[in-house]
Amino acid sequence: MRLERGGAALALVLASAPARARVETRVVEYQEGGAVLEGYLARDTAGPARKPGVLIVHDWSGVGPYVKGRAEQLAAMGYVAFAADIYGKGVRPKTAKEASAAASIYRSDRKLMRARVAAALAELRRQPDVLGNEIAAIGYCFGGTAVLELARSGADVAGVVSFHGGLDSPTPADGKNIRARVLVLHGADDPFVPEAQVKALEDELRGGGVDWQLVEYGGAVHSFTIPDAGSDNSKGAAYNAAADRRSWKAMVDFFAELFPAAR
């Protein structure tokens, strides 16, 4: 998989932001287990005094232009958006090899992954303009896996959205802990997520009595929302404009169900 650099991605993301929003951003330091983490907060200063919050978890490349752009896009839509830092301050992979190594630490230690996402959720909930009972979490690739783990931990969030995330779980019985609504947006031709993994997730969610949706996009592979992934499906990860547009709309509609007062 290609490492996300963010140039084309950021331009595309920001082009769709509402023009009248006044988005304010800042870097936020917080901690988990003695590690210093550095997230990115975005809010619309022209909006209501209190708003729903959206936690965003990055792909394997860490906090960078792409996830920051998504945070700004969500802020312009009226949410307080916080891009979590799972890796830690200063850990910003520069190559695919470095990104794979960083992500592997958390993929192989789901307890640590959950702790890092929970710390970011707590930081978002501390923001004075966030409606504490109206929070959703979204994630891309590695981050999609992370928000599903957040749900499996029993976290008090309204919903989670996984964009082309890994769907495997070493503890499928934890599906019974899920209180959030779940939306999984998946590339039907993603070679990194076998059909058996999709089926196992469906069984897990059914077994837990979860309110869930799984949408598969034909012709889409891994990283279908990330323009910098390129256009060659044969590499297993590639941008798909239609799937990007449709999956974002699916998320927007999902949020409208979660937060009807914010419409």
Residue ranges and their predicted role:
Residues 27-129, 226-238:
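Serine-hydrolase catalytic machinery in alpha/beta-hydrolase-like enzymes
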Residues 40, 206, 211-263:
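C-terminal catalytic histidine-bearing segment of alpha/beta-hydrolase fold enzymes
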Residues 70, 194-204:
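Short alpha-helix in the alpha/beta-hydrolase fold that links the catalytic acid
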Residues 129-140:
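Alpha/beta-hydrolase fold nucleophile elbow
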Residues 139-143, 147:
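Gly/Ala-rich beta-loop-alpha elbow adjacent to hydrolase catalytic centers
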Residues 156-166:
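A conserved short beta-strand
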Residues 184-186:
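Short beta-strand/loop motif that positions the catalytic acidic residue
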Residues 189-193:
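Acidic catalytic loop of the alpha/beta-hydrolase fold
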